Curated annotation (Swiss-Prot):
Keywords: Amino-acid biosynthesis, Cytoplasm, Histidine biosynthesis. This is ATP phosphoribosyltransferase regulatory subunit. InterPro entries: aa-tRNA-synth_II (IPR006195), aa-tRNA-synth_II/BPL/LPL (IPR045864), HisRS-like_core (IPR041715), HisRS/HisZ (IPR004516), HisZ (IPR004517), HisZ-C (IPR053846). NCBIfam families: hisZ_biosyn_reg (TIGR00443), PRK12292.2-4 (NF008941).
Length: 391
């Protein structure tokens, strides 16, 4: 092992990228705060038996360790389950919706050949205690306004509904075991495999057509009427109606140009129970964020409540934005012992104006010309007199 190597999947964030990332994060959280979401933090370490089990992240992707008492801990793999834990135990005591936001790193072990980060930042919100379609529309509208404030102009939010898939698969296939195979094809977006498997099933031609029609249910509001024609149950009809209401509400927000329906969507997050969505941007091969309704998760913490939310991956958002990493505008004051006091006062005055200023003793510099190249302005306090140079 080389001394400069990092653990698999871990990455350094150097100063210029750090500043760019900070600006993007701030542009997201600014909008979320304006919508009344209050930000919070949770521990990086959680108990495996609570947050680890409830996180919906595959067990092999969890970073596990033992504490001194022999209890299994995990590095948090997402933020939804930790916030659900806090909301169930401390926050959601009153009978009114709770709006919280977060910006935090999460940890997921990756296969060595995958090349994906094992630690990445998520910025998002959770709306807890409101089971209405208005709440679903709010979080989708909020993610749209937040992304636009970050400077992203070309993106689309694909919206699905767990209830439509559940209803169709139960009606046609009869049990979850048979449905699981089709869900897997949809999750992997292996539509050829999905079609071939449907054709191989011992079903009537009508039922096969219903399953195959699911792949065509993508587009605008007209998709809902087509969806209604392939589901018979009350649960399925209700899910279609929810999507119609959601579309109408997002129209009131002025957001319908940024959304589309994809009723064959299956998420890797198993706790979603209703509306779910993924955010896609140009030139990025994976969703830059996702969200949805998870009405059963808080019940697992003995505090049943409806909830919905989303998380944006800042690393993928940066990939979509492709912002130029600009050198920070920092000034430097180079001083000698004789004028140290004057140099300190000058630097303090500049900082009060909002400027970033480095104080550097001349005695600590090896190559003064090389050092000053990285600063915007250079001011000297050396010997008996002061002189300035602007670079």
């Amino acid at each position: 092992m080389f001394m400069f190597e990092k653990p698999h999947g871990m990455r350094d964030t150097l100063p210029m990228l750090y500043e760019t990332k900070k600006k993007v994060r701030s542009s997201l959280t600014e909008v979320m705060a304006l919508w009344g979401y209050q930000f919070m933090e949770t521990p990086a370490l959680e108990f495996y038996d609570t947050v680890g089990v409830q996180s919906a992240i595959l067990d092999q992707q969890l970073f596990k360790l033992l504490d001194q008492e022999g209890q299994t801990l995990v590095l948090r793999p997402d933020m939804t389950a930790p916030i659900a834990r806090v909301a169930a135990s401390k926050l959601h005591k009153d009978d009114h919706p709770l709006r919280v936001g977060y910006a935090a790193n999460v940890f997921r072990a990756q296969e060595r050949e995958g090349g994906r980060p094992a630690e990445f930042e998520q910025v998002g919100v959770e709306l807890i205690g409101d089971g209405s379609t208005s709440a679903d529309a709010e979080v989708i509208a909020l993610v749209i306004f937040s992304l636009k404030n970050a400077g992203l102009t070309s993106f689309k939010i694909s919206i699905g509904h767990v209830g439509i898939l559940d209803a169709l698969f139960v009606e046609v296939l009869g049990n979850e075991e048979r449905a699981h195979v089709l869900r897997r094809y949809l999750y992997e977006k292996n539509y050829v495999g999905y079609r071939e498997h449907v054709k191989s099933l011992n079903l009537s031609s009508i039922d096969k057509s219903r399953l195959l029609e699911l792949l065509e249910l993508r587009g605008g509001i007209e998709t809902c009427s087509r969806a209604a024609s392939i589901v018979d149950s009350e649960k399925g009809k209700r899910a279609v109606l929810e999507l119609e209401t959601l579309w109408e509400t997002l129209g009131d927000y002025g957001c319908t140009d940024d959304i589309k329906l994809d009723l064959g969507m299956v998420s890797h997050m198993s706790y979603y129970t209703g509306v779910l969505f993924e955010i896609y941007a140009e030139n990025v091969g994976f969703p830059i964020g996702n969200g949805g309704r998870y009405d059963q998760l808080l019940g697992r913490f003995d505090s049943p409540a409806p909830a919905t939310g989303f998380g944006i991956r800042t690393d993928r958002l940066l990939e979509a934005l492709k912002p130029a990493e600009e050198q920070e505008k920092i000034d430097v004051v180079i001083f000698s012992t004789e004028q140290r006091k004057e140099a300190i006062r000058f630097a303090e005055e500049e900082r009060r104006k909002g400027k970033k200023v480095v104080m550097q003793d001349l005695a600590g510099i090896g190559d003064i010309d090389q050092m000053t190249k990285s600063f915007q302005n250079v001011t000297y306090f050396i010997g008996a007199r002061k002189e300035e140079k602007h670079g």
